[in-house]
């Protein structure tokens, strides 16, 4: 089973236009879903993504990608 990334296009700290290409570099075969994730509180202050149904958040997008790569053991 492949990896799944879920991101919100409505949260203030998440820039979907720049985050999705970075997620594709992490795993080009992963499924990426863009929709409200009901994670609004943390989403106002931190970049986040759900990775295989688990939330991963960081102060910046670059730090988020590092955390996601670590979670996927790349």
Swiss-Prot record:
Pfam families in UniProt: DUF1450
Coiled-coil stretches noted in the UniProt entry, renumbered to this chain: none
Recorded family membership: Belongs to the UPF0741 family.
Name of the protein in question: UPF0741 protein BcerKBAB4_5177
């Amino acid at each position: 089973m492949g990896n799944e990334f879920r991101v919100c296009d409505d949260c203030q700290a998440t820039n979907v236009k720049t985050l999705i290409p970075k997620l594709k570099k992490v795993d080009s075969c992963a499924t990426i879903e863009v929709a409200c994730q009901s994670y609004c509180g943390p989403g106002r202050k931190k970049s986040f993504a759900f990775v295989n149904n688990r939330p991963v958040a960081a102060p910046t997008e670059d730090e988020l990608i590092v955390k996601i790569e670590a979670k996927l053991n790349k």
